[in-house]
């Protein structure tokens, strides 16, 4: 199976967690049979256009080590089984690049990484709330609640296997991690909605050490904010 993965072009939107985690997984499984276009520089530790410390979550976990590059990027002289568009549509990039869809004979899919809450072209009512609905057919949808379209499949974040730590009870000396969201502690909510105020660590291993020495990893419902934290809590052995 060969996949052409169309990445987000905007250099200020390179840290989309779903796009990065799926591309990491596909490249790990398929190797050179998964071609990223345009070349997603941050995945190869080229931060010349996008400094790592400006990325959501500072690039922790998904960018610990670079993925292996591929040799042939002349996509218009290749054929693919699938074209998959990443989350560029969430940042104003139309998922339809001239000539690209023909490379897989129109077998085109889209990743839809919208949270349940926020703004998007298509909103729906669900359980008494107005939430973001599925935006496309032939797509892989994060936080899928509509199940009446057979061309829409659920998907979610992942985390590289290299980040999994063994549980070590001998090092646990604090009840919960220093990065616990204020809402999970029943305090005034001051750290939702992204940003960097809640990023207490600038070194990734220090961040994981703090999680590993915690008996519990606290989290809370937060409208899609920092959902990778759930995975980081689990793999660190909290």
Give the positions of each predicted feature.
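Nucleotide-sugar donor-binding catalytic core of glycosyltransferases
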Residues: 2-238
